[in-house]
């Protein structure tokens, strides 16, 4: 079915009508268009064969004549089982800003904008129907729909259904399946990382090893335990973890009860050579009075203080880093939690990092997103920040307005939180690298702030984690295996079938549209209905905050990472979209119960496949990477930890041009690609020059051969001419005459070879020539012997055959042969005897 088109040719956008409204005192509106009375209620099949559709992606609802308010583009909106797809009206190209995966949507609202009518207008202008979609990837999108249709309602209902799957199996990734991006068992990769940390990289894990329980390797200090192979010890811990070799499994069973959710202290990274470790756990259950103790927990923690190498009996220091603010740790004591006391733990020191909880991070993220939308070039109200509040904020507005705009970013607190995470991780890395101390990190549950700190510290300490393979190993170990609740934090359904969703379907509360698509003087906005993807209040961008922190380190050390900021952006987009199964559910146990590894595609395999076609020239590769220079720990000083907005992620929707300009790697890569193309063109030109040179040499050699053959031919012709002349004179001296005749021309005594060269040439080329020698008549020789002799022998005669004697001297005058007549019959009468030839 052909989508309906307005008679005017192009669907006019909201900005067109808002400008007309200003010119005509509010008389213009979308109603000026004669819309076709066709309301698409479901997928009609006209877009089922789009090349942009992914595997197993199908169109559910279509909306025609939709306007993307952010960029004032008209097009077609499609809701599929994977995403909202916005296609430009003319070319049907995908508009990236208007295209967003369903799982990436944080919330969406139906908005109604009431436009005031002009006094000169008799008809009432219908309200403009808008749909605002807020993404988890820092963008706010607003779509404008045609009036007097049910398109917005159909799209809204489809989003309610598709963004609220009842079970995790209803996600698109299960419909797509593993495809060509199969997922190897993550347990094998986790064991391989443990083997590397233990110094046994030559051993490779296998499923047979896991099934037989033959993976419990060890070195002098640490060992791998299989106590949690059935997840009976701790449901949110991996099936295997590293602990001190001196601690038995029986002691672990007793010690785990003293930690929240049984997340006992285990090793997440150990430094080769020195024996220093970074350990992680949840908070201890010390109680309100902070007087509860566990001897086995204290013994386990003390085992991290192994003996220093080269020191006689001296053991290393232990730092216990509590990621929470001190007051929060004390408040947790009222619920049975709390923090350790340095007097109870051997050679330890307690440090509080003061990082806020998930709720503060969620609020901060929302504020910085609103700031970017309000002051970006592609705002959700369709206007630039230059025209905010009806005036030129930067060009001629008042100074207080400018200051207020700038302060909004600081008020969001996002950069302050990033700095807290960076400072904490840098402090941990410095203690391990400079003091060879061990550090135990925990927060409340040990899966949010703890994971941020230990993984970022490992990234600073171990250069392996700054490669593609190492980054994957780090994320799978510290984030996935140790149970960061991705389902809760990203806002996805979990294994129990109840996701973190709360959709009030009939909430008709009036509200203020954060960024009105037209000037507030032209009308008012109201929220008719809204939806949210984190009703249970567990949604929080914890992992995104960590990725942001990694990008800050890449800004400080641009040559220390194999991957580029673009890789982090694409990696984050894949995670939020739920296109792959790696980050589904809340723990390793839940992913195993769902069969994620077998049923879904692998994000890592997909990213590796993208790079396989371009090798080091791919946008995911860092062109400045120098592994030889940065082969040790990175220890940034405190002054360098001041963060900035991450342009490639934060600004890509609000300020796309500025985001591209900020990526030096992209510019360098473009120059590299251009240089590579020019190098290829140069090589092709050089090959062409070589071919032409070879051809010229061949032609020159051929020309030399031809010249040689020509010279030989000329010499042969000259020699033949001389021989012919000599033979002619000899024959004529005997009184004979040479005649040339052909088979088709009668003999002509006047056509001798020397007297008619043109005929000679014709005979030589076109006729069969016969040569005859005849005797000259006697009367011709007896009458004028001198003339005969001169005619035959004298080289001084003229071309006409006239003798030039006596003007010139003649060697033949007076010769004894003048007038000599040859008698050939006498030769026949000669008697020749054989005895003449006998030897004497």
From Swiss-Prot:
Localization in the cell: Cytoplasm; Endosome membrane
Catalytically driven reaction(s): a 1,2-diacyl-sn-glycero-3-phospho-(1D-myo-inositol-3-phosphate) + H2O = a 1,2-diacyl-sn-glycero-3-phospho-(1D-myo-inositol) + phosphate; a 1,2-diacyl-sn-glycero-3-phospho-(1D-myo-inositol-3,5-bisphosphate) + H2O = a 1,2-diacyl-sn-glycero-3-phospho-(1D-myo-inositol-5-phosphate) + phosphate
Region span, Disordered: 1-28, 506-535, 745-771
Positions that bind substrate: 332-335, 357-358, 443-449, 489
E.C. code: 3.1.3.95, 3.1.3.64
Tissue specificity statement from the Swiss-Prot or TrEMBL entry: Mostly expressed in siliques and leaves (including hydathodes), and, to a lower extent, in flowers and roots.
GO cellular component assignments: cytoplasmic vesicle; endosome membrane
Topological category with respect to the lipid bilayer: Peripheral membrane protein
Main localisation: cytoplasm
GRAM domain ranges (all copies): 45-112
Compositionally biased tracts (Basic and acidic residues): 13-25
Keyword Cytoplasm assigned: yes
UniProt-listed SMART domains: GRAM
Coiled coil: 666-734
Effect of gene knockout: No visible phenotype in normal conditions. Impaired accumulation of PtdIns5P in response to stress such as dehydration, leading to an increased resistance.
Keywords: Coiled coil, Cytoplasm, Endosome, Hydrolase, Lipid metabolism, Membrane, Protein phosphatase
Annotated PANTHER family: MYOTUBULARIN-RELATED, PHOSPHATIDYLINOSITOL-3-PHOSPHATE PHOSPHATASE
Name the UniProt record assigns to this protein: Phosphatidylinositol-3-phosphatase myotubularin-1
Species whose genome carries this gene: Arabidopsis thaliana (Mouse-ear cress)
Gene name per UniProt: MTM1
């Amino acid at each position: 079915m052909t989508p309906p088109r307005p008679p005017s040719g192009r669907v006019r956008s909201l900005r067109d009508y808002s400008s007309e409204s200003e010119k005509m005192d509010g008389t213009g509106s979308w109603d000026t268009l004669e819309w076709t009375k066709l309301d698409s209620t479901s997928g009609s099949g006209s877009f089922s064969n789009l090349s942009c559709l992914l595997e197993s992606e199908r169109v559910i609802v279509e909306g025609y004549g939709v306007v993307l308010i952010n960029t004032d583009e008209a097009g077609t909106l499609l809701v599929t089982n994977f995403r909202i797809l916005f296609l430009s009206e003319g070319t049907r190209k995908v508009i990236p800003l208007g295209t967003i995966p369903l799982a990436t949507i944080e919330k969406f609202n139906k908005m109604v904008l009431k436009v005031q009518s002009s006094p000169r207008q008799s008809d009432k202008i219908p309200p403009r129907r808008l749909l605002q979609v807020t993404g988890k990837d820092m963008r706010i999108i607003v779509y404008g729909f045609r009036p007097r249709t049910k398109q917005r309602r159909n799209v809204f209902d489809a989003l309610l259904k598709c963004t609220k799957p009842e079970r995790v199996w209803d996600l698109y990734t299960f419909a797509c399946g593993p495809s060509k991006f199969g997922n190897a068992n993550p347990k094998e990769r986790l064991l391989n990382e443990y083997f590397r940390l233990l110094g046994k990289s030559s051993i490779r894990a296998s499923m047979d090893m896991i099934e037989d329980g033959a993976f419990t390797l060890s070195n002098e200090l640490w060992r791998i335990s299989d106590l949690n192979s059935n997840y009976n010890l701790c449901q949110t811990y991996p099936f295997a973890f590293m602990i001190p070799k001196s601690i038995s499994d029986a002691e672990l069973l007793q010690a785990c009860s003293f930690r929240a959710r049984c997340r006992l202290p285990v090793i997440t990274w150990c430094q080769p050579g020195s024996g220093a470790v970074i350990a992680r756990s949840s908070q201890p259950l010390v109680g309100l009075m902070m007087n509860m103790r566990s001897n086995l927990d204290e013994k386990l923690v003390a085992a991290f203080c192994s003996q220093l190498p080269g020191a006689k009996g001296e053991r290393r220091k232990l730092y216990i880093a509590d990621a929470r603010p001190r007051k929060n740790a004390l408040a947790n004591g009222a619920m049975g939690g709390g923090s350790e006391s340095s007097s109870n733990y051997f050679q330890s020191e307690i440090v509080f990092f003061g990082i806020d909880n998930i709720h503060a991070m969620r609020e901060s993220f929302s504020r910085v997103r609103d700031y970017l939308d309000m002051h970006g070039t592609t705002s959700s109200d369709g206007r630039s920040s230059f025209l905010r509040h009806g005036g030129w904020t930067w060009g001629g507005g008042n100074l207080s307005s400018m200051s207020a705009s700038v302060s909004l970013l600081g008020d969001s607190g996002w950069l302050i939180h990033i700095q807290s995470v960076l400072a904490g991780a840098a402090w941990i890395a410095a203690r391990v690298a400079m003091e060879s101390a061990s550090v135990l990190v925990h927060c409340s549950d040990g899966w949010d702030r703890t994971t941020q700190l230990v993984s970022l510290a490992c990234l600073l300490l171990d250069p392996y984690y700054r490669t593609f393979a190492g980054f994957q190993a780090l994320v799978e170990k510290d984030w996935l295996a140790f149970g960061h609740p991705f389902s809760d934090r990203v806002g996805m359904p979990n294994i129990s079938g109840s996701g973190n969703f709360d959709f009030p379907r009939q909430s008709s509360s009036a509200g203020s549209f954060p960024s009105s698509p037209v000037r507030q003087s032209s009308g008012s906005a109201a929220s008719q209905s809204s939806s949210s993807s984190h009703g249970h209040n567990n949604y929080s961008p914890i992992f995104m905050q960590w990725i942001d922190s990694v990008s800050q380190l890449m800004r400080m050390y641009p040559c220390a990472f194999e991957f580029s900021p673009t890789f982090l952006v694409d990696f984050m987009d894949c995670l939020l979209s739920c296109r792959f199964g790696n980050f589904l559910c809340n723990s390793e146990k839940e992913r195993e119960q769902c069969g994620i590894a077998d049923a879904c595609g692998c994000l890592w395999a997909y990213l590796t496949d993208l790079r396989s076609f371009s090798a080091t020239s791919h946008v995911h590769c860092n062109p400045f990477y120098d592994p030889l220079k940065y082969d040790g720990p990175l220890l940034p000083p405190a002054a360098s930890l001041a963060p900035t907005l991450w342009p490639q992620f934060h600004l890509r929707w609000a300020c796309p041009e500025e985001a591209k300009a900020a990526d030096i790697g992209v510019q360098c890569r473009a120059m590299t690609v251009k240089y590579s193309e020019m190098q290829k063109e140069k090589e092709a030109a050089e090959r062409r020059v070589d071919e032409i040179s070879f051809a010229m040499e061949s032609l020159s050699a051929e020309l030399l051969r031809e010249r040689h053959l020509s010279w030989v031919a000329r010499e042969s012709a000259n020699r033949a001419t001389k021989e012919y002349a000599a033979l002619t004179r000899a024959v004529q001296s005997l009184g004979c005459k040479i005649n040339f005749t052909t088979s088709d021309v009668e003999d002509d005594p006047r056509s001798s070879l020397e007297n008619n060269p043109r005929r000679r040439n014709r005979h030589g080329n076109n006729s069969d020539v016969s040569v005859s020698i005849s005797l000259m008549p006697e009367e011709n020789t007896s009458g004028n012997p001198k003339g005969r002799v001169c005619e035959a022998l004298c080289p001084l005669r003229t071309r006409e055959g006239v003798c030039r004697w006596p003007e010139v001297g003649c060697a033949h005058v007076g010769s004894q042969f003048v007038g000599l007549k040859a008698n050939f019959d006498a030769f026949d009468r000669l008697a020749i005897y054989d005895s003449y030839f006998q030897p004497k």
